[in-house]
């Protein structure tokens, strides 16, 4: 990453920090009244000093992060440091590195156990050529699956800023010579030093703070796609990264921002609008699960289960080989005829409804759906919310963040004119007038469809109560209060989630504030009874950001809501009336918060022991290798 890129990043941090301190939106930053009292000027000066310190610290982390890749390669070589990474260390290093294998291990399940290594804090001084770290950890490893270091936090250790005290995290997975598998998590205090005239930072102190390893007899899951999908064309479609190809072409200048056709009036690499999804369905009622995959740029895939561990692509056979630009799908017997039908969400086109007619899916959107289905559908959920025995539909919608800077003269984003009706634009404009870019960012309206029988749908009379006008990633239903009807939880990005109690026939009541729900970048939600007490609990996917934790911790007078935005996923224990947040980073909390930048985490009982486990996908954006920069936070 270039110095210019560093400065751009620092400027973004500066703007965000000012916004956090002042509690204003981006539009309000810079509109401060210059006629301040002397006391206010002093306060502002201190704030500016604090912000400058934060920016300098974050810039240094940005510049040092690529150096950690050399340590990552050392892990792969099972030598820390190796000949390449040894240059990261000073000629003389103060080291606290005496570690010993766990004296006791805690049995987990199915042959897995974990244990903390003994760590001796005694400091020794050694020369760079003689430095050997974590030798005992590597001694039993046959080969490494993956391993990495990352910055957790850091700060300058002296006024001259020639020393930088950092906390590093390390994690990895390896196969041992014994055949067992091992994972580790470690924390290291590393001091980086430079002289007054130079900018070459080197590690002068290394202290292993903690090291935990998990052992298992074999992996819980093994990648078998190559064996399960024999058809080469289907395999290529399932594994190809066409979005990466388009991204590379765009940044190389071979493809325009506005691509041909109306499907992609704007194209951005870090898209949140077009995202693949997976739906499970027994398409042929043979008792085996089949897989439907929505695609961004090619036709969708229907992988039929051959009952022998393999799948065949048969979308054409069922009429489901539709062109991509799809983001969500859900199967259900919406006409009560005994076979699954399909609702399909499409971000840059209106949603579609396919009826299963003797094994052939027909688009019956115009005939059976009363209103126009919305654009920008991000996810779909189904429940019989009114207790009439028919499945109803909730559509979550999410406006394209990539177009947030494409504004029209009246300050509304272009997508609002392209994808909303005039009436919807008017309602959206009202939401814009009350917006906060981080805490209350508006989006398109969600939609509730009521099943009127024979597979037909109309707008529910409660629709206005659930529209919300937020950036809604996912909604899901569960009878939280045990009154016989399903309640609705909506995970919203850039704002508070919404928990809507179903009081049918008296509509929905928003009980978010009274239920104990915390603010977060909501990107998924799942219901289950994790502690088997007969009451449903809730797992909400949010964002855990090391950078966000660092910045919000160092800014004084911060709006407390901002601190919550980077604290990770939330596990709530339900009591039938309210939620209690039981997850967090403290030792007393359930350790399910630090799941990275999480998307759609789900409860599932992986080991069939009767207790719900959690799977939480995470990540944000990985650039194609041909255009990627040497940076990853």
Label each residue range with its predicted role:
Residues 12-22:
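Bacterial N-terminal signal peptides
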Residues 2-12:
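Bacterial N-terminal signal peptides that target proteins for export
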